[in-house]
């Protein structure tokens, strides 16, 4: 808008991956026919994994802005880059944070997506190496409207800290229902919970103190 880049005019094209791997693959194939030079996106690891080979084989540079799965940069794709830390790095930070907060018995909950499961596994390994007991490791099903069952299982494990590695819609609902059941255990999330909608779903009181 202000004259382009290096004296070249830049045209911006958009596609919506819908947060779905199949849709992302179709969108990547459409963009690959448009003579583009670079793509910024996508956000989720499973979404990126469905599209990165298409862009690489077409000679298109891809810069992912929120895809943290380790394997995305272990494939040797010369045109793939990202601007976020990998799951192994986030796992180290999560462990350091949990130790700093003094937790001794940690529950880890993920949602079976590439991102969430990868971060959960890295965090579990780091916590065990740091001699922090992991008393619960399981997954919920994304998109459900009631997580009382998994919260009951979590509570039965008697953790003093819960690390949820999934996304903000589920995190918000977990926080709300945790408060409704009168359970005050501290909760922490990964980078995918960084969205104002989490507070809207949980309610300000339930979101208070969430890490």
Regions found by a protein language model. Give the residues of each.
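Residues that mark the start of a beta-strand
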Residues: 11, 104-107, 160-161
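Internal alpha/beta domain cores that form substrate/cofactor-binding pockets in large enzymes
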Residues: 134-135, 150-153, 157, 170-187, ...
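Short, well-structured alpha-helical segments in soluble
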Residues: 14, 18-37, 96-100, 145-158
């Amino acid at each position: 808008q202000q004259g382009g880049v290096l004296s070249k005019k830049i045209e911006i094209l958009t596609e919506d991956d819908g947060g779905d791997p199949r849709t992302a693959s179709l969108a990547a194939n459409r963009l690959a026919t448009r003579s583009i030079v670079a793509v910024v996106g996508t956000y989720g690891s499973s979404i990126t994994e469905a599209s990165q080979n298409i862009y690489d084989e077409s000679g298109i540079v891809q810069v992912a802005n929120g895809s943290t799965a380790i394997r995305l940069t272990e494939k040797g794709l010369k045109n793939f880059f990202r601007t976020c830390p990998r799951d192994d790095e986030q796992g180290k930070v999560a462990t350091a944070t949990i130790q700093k907060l003094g937790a001794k018995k940690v529950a880890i909950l993920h949602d079976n997506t590439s991102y969430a499961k990868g971060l959960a596994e890295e965090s579990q390994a780091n916590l065990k190496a740091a001699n922090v007991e992991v008393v619960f490791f399981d997954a919920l099903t994304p998109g459900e409207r009631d997580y009382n069952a998994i919260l009951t299982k979590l509570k039965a494990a008697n953790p003093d800290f819960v690390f949820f590695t999934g996304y903000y819609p589920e995190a918000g609902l977990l926080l709300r229902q945790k408060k409704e059941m009168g359970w005050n255990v501290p909760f922490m999330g990964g980078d995918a919970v960084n969205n104002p909608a989490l507070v809207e779903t949980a309610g300000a009181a339930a979101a208070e103190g969430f890490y």
